[in-house]
């Protein structure tokens, strides 16, 4: 029987960063400010604000945002009464200059994200963030693709570069609670006791809350979630549900159970371009182990090439595509469309 009574955790909000994916990075400054202020008032201690793909994500490959990272951060940070603001940075997209800009604007936490087997590309960014005395997080994405032993080796690299917290990230929403437990226990056992451990979930198999609780039980003390689940795929772990479950279990989050519901219902749901839910395409992300932010790219390719998004996503999973290969989605759709046309031609002959 799990007993987490009295355990303290830090909840990290994703609404204004992972939530940029389903908004196609087009949140307005007013939307950002009102949601961030609501989260702050609800007691959320850490709020991530950047382009969905992190600092410097504005590009043809990832999508152009309504405003620059500087504008979003500059609008939100001065409004915060108790919450700190974090920024995501993917080496190869974000640079040390972006990191310095974020620090100058008052960003407290930087999360340096790599594919779960490529931690070595994070050294420059992690060591720089630590030298700036920032709260520095190593963020291992698509963690279902690596064994617990491999994740341990990658986590130790990031810790060695200076990260004071390591995240195991279920970018595809593929993991089940046992997958989370075995990975987080292994990483927790290998890290220094003072190094924190985090978990980032997606709700593609509706496991976001269960996986996050499993993570806490395995030793995680930072958990990502989003108000109304606003995030890529079927969204992140829905914050208001997670907070209610924590409250029931006696896990201390410092977040007000009812205020966070109001933020989700009154501020986040009304700005959704589509309802964030487990539909056949987002379910396929979780089932096939595909990067959650590929969802809208696959839906777009379906319209363009007439190949169902689900087929595209299954093929991407078969090919083992990872974050950063967004350009290959179109390529995959074209290949499948050609194969379909050839099969139809053969059948007609």
Curated annotation (Swiss-Prot):
Positions contributing to Mn(2+) binding: 18, 200, 202
EC number: 4.1.3.39
Gene3D superfamilies for this protein: 1.10.8.60, Aldolase class I
InterPro entries: 2-IPM_HCS-like (IPR050073), 4OH_2_O-val_aldolase (IPR017629), Aldolase_TIM (IPR013785), DmpG_comm (IPR012425), DRE_TIM_HOA (IPR035685), PYR_CT (IPR000891)
Top-level taxon of the source organism: Bacteria
Pfam family, one: DmpG_comm
Residue numbers binding substrate: 17-18, 171, 200, 291
GO-annotated biological processes: catabolic process; L-leucine biosynthetic process
Site (Transition state stabilizer): 17
Catalytic activity: (S)-4-hydroxy-2-oxopentanoate = acetaldehyde + pyruvate
Active site annotation, chain numbering: 21 (proton acceptor)
A GO molecular function held by the record: 2-isopropylmalate synthase activity
Positions of the Pyruvate carboxyltransferase domain: 9-261
Keyword entries, A-Z: Aromatic hydrocarbons catabolism, Lyase, Manganese, Metal-binding
PANTHER family: 2-ISOPROPYLMALATE SYNTHASE 1, CHLOROPLASTIC-RELATED (PTHR10277:SF9), HOMOCITRATE SYNTHASE-RELATED (PTHR10277)
HAMAP family per UniProt: HOA (MF_01656)
Family: Belongs to the 4-hydroxy-2-oxovalerate aldolase family.
NCBIfam families: 4OH_2_O_val_ald, PRK08195.1
Protein name: 4-hydroxy-2-oxovalerate aldolase 1
Lineage, broadest ranks: Bacteria, Pseudomonadati, Pseudomonadota, Betaproteobacteria, Burkholderiales
